[in-house]
């Protein structure tokens, strides 16, 4: 996950506070100082950090709290709220709608990853059912059209550009006319970047915008610049009518928190963040779920969106029926592994689970987790239909395990490890037996049939402990809003929207 170091530091500060025998001014002060230190190291402006401390102390007045009040929970809620306020510009961004043609213009400085981000943005919307297209109006940088052409071809997205024409306005207009005729409902225009903010860049952007009349202008910014993002975002907002911001390169830089908070201070909504070079390393940015993940509380609403993307609607009733029966077979595990691999980077997916520490899977270790899943799937490929569909653990005799190991080319230990993992997941799945199913068979309507006891029962003990027990889960539901939390639990097959 992005900002793993920052999230880990804040989570540790809250955990140390929670472990204290008595919560007094000294313990609160130490907790807030640790959180402030972590934010300053992430290049968040000093004034923002100081204001956050002041606001938390106003909310958490230990002297006026009634006896028996859960001080730990109030402090955690205050930290969550203030972090959200720090990253929330308080202004919604324009949203594209399927079937209704939208023109989106990308602007930014050279080297910010603008051209790559155009393709990621198009690919994201393509997976959501849009018909995107790309227009390269960047005639300043040599190789810009080649790069866009290569990226678009790989993602199977229609594109337009010219090696001969030097007028970006003419290219933009021609591309727009062409894709409107082809009924594209999302036309993305990539414009020229420069090494610095200069009059020529802003004038060219103004001309392209005047000719194409975009519904949205997106400013792409390098997240590694930290709090310097404030001046950059402000300048582009004033000169190019920027309606939204995408921050790139948040996967490997410690200053990402500074960039996010600085952009929010300009009242410009951040709509996506880039978390790597690959086309699927691109996340929608929503403040509450982002802070929830940062604090190790997960983002199961985001996970539910990913599940909905990869699981056809006609498969959902069958999955829900198995959930109600408490039936979890190896075949079902195999199918869920297939879905998991389609969801994108595994570290990004796991960071959406409550209790997952982003430091447990640094970026370099994601491939190991992915390889393990593929290894388990190879083992299951060597099983018979009876073995895959059985719920009887005694069926897996020693002779069967030896045969499966030989057939898959794996060690016996690998097979037993996979079976242990299956048993653990099956036990968790069985706890949802008897859950009342929605009449329409949709996972999205399951949340209204859940109660707090079922949620508590289904979550693994270590995850529940990380969330602060039943009280912590209730507090999290309150923080996220009941509906949002129900959506979040949907991502685990426990509910959703």
Curated annotation (Swiss-Prot):
GO terms for biological process: SRP-dependent cotranslational protein targeting to membrane, translocation. Residues 296-497 are annotated as: M-domain. Residues 1-295 are annotated as: G-domain. GO terms for cellular component: cytosol; endoplasmic reticulum; signal recognition particle, endoplasmic reticulum targeting. Pfam families: SRP54, SRP54_N, SRP_SPB. Its EC number is 3.6.5.4. Belongs to the GTP-binding SRP family. SRP54 subfamily. HAMAP family: SRP54 (MF_00306). This is Signal recognition particle subunit SRP54 1. It comes from Hordeum vulgare (Barley). The gene is SRP54-1.
